[in-house]
């Protein structure tokens, strides 16, 4: 369940990203005071998972200044967020010049599902992988969920993810929401 959902309003996205940046900075101050380098499970700080679905949409807004701020905020969150418990996951259907290299290169894990061209595959995985035999454009069109995963400096590995229908996703969301509500009720002593 999302704590906050941002639709197609770039201004809302910027506000949320600024708030996450402030939270990240506060956590770094707390970590510094405790003499720690990163958030640990035993610290009791919840992870913030930031999912940006269709990254290119927010990076191609007609307002150049807004576009630039989204890119800068995301770059900071991706670069510094993980140690503070702020994890960014970004997806785009058509990788290209809309996603700045300075942002794209910060992602430690990259998954290239079937692409139309070797250049698109390289845009995701990094320059030169397609010519080295790691080309997501060679994945057959009927192989849903098959792609190449590049994980923190390793060679890309061919993987298969699960493909879920909208109905299956809805059932998972409903079940997870109910479990989260049950846990909250138990923790607060409230009754449903």
Regions found by a protein language model. Give the residues of each.
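Flexible gly/pro/ser-rich segments immediately N-terminal to CXXCH heme-c attachment motifs
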Residues: 41
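Short polybasic amphipathic segments
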Residues: 145-151
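Conserved alpha/beta core segments of nucleic-acid transaction machinery
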Residues: 152-158, 162-192
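P-loop NTPase catalytic phosphate-binding loop
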Residues: 1-37, 46-139, 162, 167-170, ...
